[in-house]
């Protein structure tokens, strides 16, 4: 029976590497998958899933108006799995449509993304995945400044932490760091020694 999975973690926890690994494992067995990502993620181009270690694949971009249920239902083949990167940028209706893909089409959906933003608030997509997912899995990484588990994302501008601003700000290692709770509230500057 198909399930809706939400695999979340702080920045730099290997979410994109994991999604690309899952896609590879299915496809190596001649089991087609559909790889999707938020159309808001433009770091390496719209419709690209790119890891920090250089792995990259094309994906179907999801925009505000995209009906993902209809998109998957209208395919000429039935994929073995739907894989979604940057799912924190999804809207409530996207998450419900992914749940329908699982329940009505019996296709597993694995969604990968951040749980909380740099203000330590839930993203809309993450909020509804936490509510509707059948399985939750935390992908772990360590704090940029110590050895504890990172559960939060710290945003830096010009080497200084920032706690206010628009929720959606696309950036990579240069702007966001995985941190533990202690270093979220009492951060070091990014130039300080670990």
Swiss-Prot record:
The keyword ATP-binding applies. One of its GO terms (biological process) is DNA biosynthetic process. It is found in: Cytoplasm. InterPro entries: P-loop_NTPase (IPR027417), Thymidine_kinase (IPR001267), Thymidine_kinase_CS (IPR020633). ATP binds at residues 9-16, 85-88. It catalyses: thymidine + ATP = dTMP + ADP + H(+). The keyword Mitochondrion does not apply. Its EC number is 2.7.1.21. Pfam families: TK (PF00265). The active site is at residue 86. Keywords: ATP-binding, Cytoplasm, DNA synthesis, Kinase, Metal-binding, Nucleotide-binding, Transferase, Zinc. Zn(2+) binds at residues 143, 146, 180, 183. One of its GO terms (cellular component) is cytosol. PROSITE patterns: TK_CELLULAR_TYPE. It comes from the Bacteria. It is an enzyme of class 2 (transferase). GO terms for molecular function: ATP binding; thymidine kinase activity; zinc ion binding. Belongs to the thymidine kinase family. Homotetramer. This is Thymidine kinase. It comes from Enterococcus faecalis (strain ATCC 700802 / V583). The lineage of its organism: Bacteria, Bacillati, Bacillota, Bacilli, Lactobacillales. The gene is tdk.
